[in-house]
Amino acid sequence: VPQEILNLPKDKPLIYCAMGSSANRAVLRTVLESFDGAPYTVISPMKAHFEKEKLRAPSNVHLFDWLPADKVNPLADVAVIHGGQGTVQTACASGTPFVGIGLQPEQEANIDMIARQGCAIRLGKRNFTRQQLLQSIESLLKDEHARKRAKEIQSLSQAWDGTKNAAKFLIETFG
């Protein structure tokens, strides 16, 4: 974890925002503008996207070229993610409730699965607004049930040894 993140003030909720390599300009712009002036500290590994699209990050958004998602997700109070398998699994393994903005049908399905478990909110990529994003974040910050469910899902995921199970499957299937 970059020292800059560890040194951030702890007086505001920390939001981890990662929209993946499939993020588009419209979604990035809406997410970016949503955080401007919001009462959060935001960390994001989307520096290249912002530079490519010539977008300016608000003062409360700290951009990085790359972040170890498995290390920074547990530090976050809420994540804002695109809903790919990796981002959803990392949020779940970290016990972090999230707002998902699926950019593809598979991502929307991933988000919906966790939303049904009570610790995620899905927003539509074409029509979400700043107000909806901030309300969703605020809802997850205040919702004790969502935080509890996120921790329960984290416990379930920790009970499985994915590496061991994958190795066992490969050996049993392919010798």
Regions flagged by a language model, labelled:
Residues 13-15, 92-97, 149:
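Short, surface-exposed connector motifs at secondary-structure boundaries
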Residues 31, 42, 72, 80, ...:
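Hydrophobic, well-ordered secondary-structure elements that form the walls
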Residues 66-113:
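A donor-sugar binding/catalytic signature common to diverse glycosyltransferases
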Residues 130-175:
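C-terminal amphipathic helix plus adjacent low-complexity
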Residues 1-78:
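Donor-nucleotide binding loops and adjacent catalytic segments primarily
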